[in-house]
């Protein structure tokens, strides 16, 4: 991960550190190395905004998961279920996790969202009023996320919408 810290690198150190910590996403990857470097440049000062360095690696790892699922001919949800961290998982920073609700959360979200098994090309009729069908999983180490409570809360407040966003704070947030 390379970060353009601008002329002063105000918050580059913290942003780059967080990018490295979140670089592998919520996936159990046996052989992974994440390198993150911040650079001084002649660009305007830049640094932490909203997710403090988490957005860039999250976008990269989730895009990679989509590319892999397409090349392997596997449903994107299925690939994430196979590789998602489970109870007792060890992160690439060697942190041992206790209870991990990733697969349960992903399964429940895909059920509520009406995600059907199979690639989008064979999934059946596609709604014309909504462009695309995506799912993303927020990965915030150290933050307690109770999937059961979140899904109970979201079920009645599920939203459909259109938009382009760079994080899960966007249009479908409960």
Feature annotation, model-predicted:
Residues 10-22, 50-78, 83, 104, ...:
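Alpha-helical support elements that line or immediately flank enzyme active sites
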Residues 85-174:
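Helix-loop-helix junctions that connect adjacent transmembrane helices in secondary transporters/permeases
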Residues 1-57, 138-147, 152-174:
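Gly/Pro-rich active-site capping loops and adjacent beta-alpha segments
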Residues 40-45, 81-90:
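Short acidic (Asp/Glu) and glycine-rich catalytic loops that position anionic groups and cofactors
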